[in-house]
Amino acid sequence: MALLILLRHGQSVWNEKNLFSGWVDIPLSQQGIEEAFSAGRAIQNLPIDCIFTSTLVRSLMTALLAMTNHHSKKIPYIVHEDPKAKEMSRIYSAEEENNMIPLYQSSALNERMYGELQGKNKKQTAEQFGEERVKLWRRSYKTAPPQGESLYDTKQRTLPYFEKNILPQLQNGKNVFVSAHGNSLRSLIMDLEKLSEEEVLSLELPTGKPVVYQWKNHKIEKHPEFFG
């Protein structure tokens, strides 16, 4: 059996201001920092062998802060994709390498790209375009905001990345911690739980609250201790 821990990043500065963030690289707010520490305490006794985050700083901050509480005391280190950076950051101490946890970053796990809504206030946007249209942009499965992505579009990048990079880790018995975003995680959970296009629309993931699945009997299922 292996664990899959999914965590939406803590509150960002733009979450706090009720702005659309998308791919804009916004850090955590003070509350978000506290949420990351709290999430870390919730998973501190769970085994973790590798970490995956998006390329956005709020995702990375959440993972790093959460891991400060981990019982293993192991240090996350970023595994660079660029060959030169990977070689330049090589660890030559086997002892220290054993005390570290690899962390992989990919834009495939980034938040849904909100296009022309990015940086705009959510309430004011609803007043400008109408609540129904904005609700359609935000909550429908295949309708995207101007120049942005729908949840369907987001899934076209998150799911292939999951199947190529994360699923094999679980199949090899590795425990995986994924720190990402509301919509990138919703798109994955849609597949994990076999949710319909209608069912996924009501799926809400609060900031800083981990959800745990397990790889068991050749399939991913909800962990009974965390889903009750």
Curated annotation (Swiss-Prot):
Principal EC category: isomerase
EC number(s) recorded for this UniProt protein: 5.4.2.11
UniProt-listed InterPro entries: His_Pase_superF_clade-1, His_PPase_superfam, PG/BPGM_mutase_AS, Phosphogly_mut1
Residues at the catalytic site: 9 (tele-phosphohistidine intermediate), 111 (proton donor/acceptor)
PROSITE patterns in alphabetical order: PG_MUTASE (PS00175)
Pathway entry: Carbohydrate degradation; glycolysis; pyruvate from D-glyceraldehyde 3-phosphate: step 3/5
Keywords: Gluconeogenesis, Glycolysis, Isomerase
GO biological process terms on file: gluconeogenesis; glycolytic process
Highest taxon of the lineage: Bacteria
Primary role: Catalyzes the interconversion of 2-phosphoglycerate and 3-phosphoglycerate.
Family annotation (PANTHER family): PHOSPHOGLYCERATE MUTASE
Protein name: 2,3-bisphosphoglycerate-dependent phosphoglycerate mutase
Originating organism: Chlamydia pneumoniae
Gene label: gpmA
